[in-house]
Amino acid sequence: MASSHSLLFSSSFLSKPSSFTSSLRRFVYLPTRQFWPRQRHGFSTVFAVATEPAISSSGPKKAEPSTVVLPSNESSDKLLKIRHTCAHVMAMAVQKLFPDAKVTIGPWIDNGFYYDFDMEPLTDKDLKRIKKEMDRIISRNLPLLREEVSREEAKKRIMAINEPYKMEILDGIKEEPITVYHIGNEWWDLCAGPHVETTGKINKKAVELESVAGAYWRGDEKRQMLQRIYGTAWESEEQLKAYLHFKEEAKRRDHRRIGQDLDLFSIQDEAGGGLVFWHPKGAIVRNIIEESWKKMHVEHGYDLIYTPHVAKADLWKISGHLDFYRENMYDQMEIEDELYQLRPMNCPYHILLYQRKRQSYRDLPIRVAELGTVYRYELSGSLHGLFRVRGFTQDDAHIFCLEDQIKDEIRGVLDLTEEILSRFGFNKYEVNLSTRPEKSVGGDDIWEKATCALRDALDDKGWSYEVDEGGGAFYGPKIDLKIEDALGRKWQCSTIQVDFNLPQRFDITYVDTNSDKKRPIMIHRAVLGSLERFFGVLIEHYAGDFPLWLSPVQVRVLPVTDNQLEFCKEVSKKLRACGVRAELCHGERLPKLIRNAETQKIPLMAVVGPKEVETGTVTVRSRFGGELGTIPVDDLINKINIAVETRTAL
């Protein structure tokens, strides 16, 4: 068994950087440009990807490409060892080429490895040199040798090679002996393993250095900025090619690029990082999401509310945010000798609404829901498009209920979650139930009752789930749900959390049948997580090709020549009057107008030539179905309305 200090050097100790490929799932790439997720028992640790690119449906038919199953660190101990050893080999190569470079830490991560160095900024040319040196080290088949030394011996060796970061790491290790790994007799590092037996066990054709990024030592912006080199490593060259193919597809779907290309949203430097500007087309999609969300919540018995974006600092003291969440909050501001702060969460506001009057057991459950904008302090280096921002809108709701209502309320939340997510095309989930940690508030009975209620609700739903023993918050058990996108990636969106803490902090009560005051159960829940993040996931899930009912522009009206422009204006006006999101585009030759519409991912094009003007019709062309024929404008409106109502394509 590894000594406890080994945690300092294993990837499980290190916080893994977020990336668009950090939650890979299994998927199959078919030549129709569609990605169909495949799932077993609720979740999977490997995925399959084809090694050939997609082909045009109009081109010669080819056999479906064979799939390659890509293992994960969890499913393949061999792969984990390869990646960990690659981090060491890379560090050795860097110090051979750049003798002044100081090493820090280098773990394995989901898709490869990284190592942080204190050195001058690196270029792409430098990465190529480092990779060549790594290949030489691998080809030499050097042994990986484990050694145990005393603390004093470790200090002596570190001082001899002047590695200050390693000395800091060593100072944080409490137990002895200290473990060291050598590559041959030329290079060593503080490490507890595991590693492959020799560098020759690594397939150098299955290793690639991907990028360089800045990273603060220990994640502290006041400490030294380091150079972090990311690499990927696999068991075979075929696996590497499959992974790179997946990565290219993920890059094609990057919501930041698509958001700019389709004019959906932006981050304006003048306003500041992490603050989202929703453009008109993006705002249309957001409004559709919001209206669908509101309608379904009302149908499920929720009251919709709005609350302020700022509150007195005293409120955040009562809630505990100032004690436990202050580093994520913006600074206080003084107004007429009182301190105020932007809200990082909506929960205290909903409690204040509950407290506005005396509540009876007959009033429970009370369900309140809000699309509430919150603000959280994030370092600029952690911001990422719509996925990590400083101001975002949560689809927040809270339920106040009796103990014996917990199960039914949780089941209702699960039903609502399924209904909302399936509407937007997400039907596969990974579900986790997190139970009581060592330190917690609340008695044994209520913890047991709440946990059983969550478990029974999941069982009644028939969903597969994993139990994370001891993984709950100190104030209650929870259910986390990750949705699976078209590439099989998992995204954390939905959370259902029982809370025994805030009702106690705010001393909220209800009157029972004996007119005695009792403490209600509080359930926090979010289905989408945040509108910004969910929109980003939607963009990448559909690659910007939104279905007709969700597309910001459903029809683009195109004249063959400007002679048909007046009729096209009438068509556009009629479509919009009937609720169809239509726009007119002209001024170019028809082939270019069609190409532009396809580039902008417009689902339908209504082409108007002399015959269409004469007969009062339009010739409809679908991005997905080709020519749909020449039909009266009223028929097109009816077809679109039916397709939107049933959420189907034309």
Curated annotation (Swiss-Prot):
GO terms for biological process: embryo development ending in seed dormancy; threonyl-tRNA aminoacylation. It comes from the Eukaryota. The lineage of its organism: Eukaryota, Viridiplantae, Streptophyta, Embryophyta, Tracheophyta. This is Threonine--tRNA ligase, chloroplastic/mitochondrial 2. SMART domains: tRNA_SAD. It catalyses: tRNA(Thr) + L-threonine + ATP = L-threonyl-tRNA(Thr) + AMP + diphosphate + H(+). NCBIfam families: thrS. Zn(2+) binds at residues 347, 398, 524. GO terms for molecular function: ATP binding; metal ion binding; threonine-tRNA ligase activity. The keyword Plastid applies. The keyword Transmembrane helix does not apply. It comes from Arabidopsis thaliana. InterPro entries: aa-tRNA-synt_IIb, aa-tRNA-synth_II, aa-tRNA-synth_II/BPL/LPL, Anticodon-bd, Anticodon-bd_dom_sf, Thr-tRNA-ligase_IIa, Thr/Ala-tRNA-synth_IIc_edit, ThrRS_anticodon. GO terms for cellular component: chloroplast; chloroplast stroma; mitochondrion.
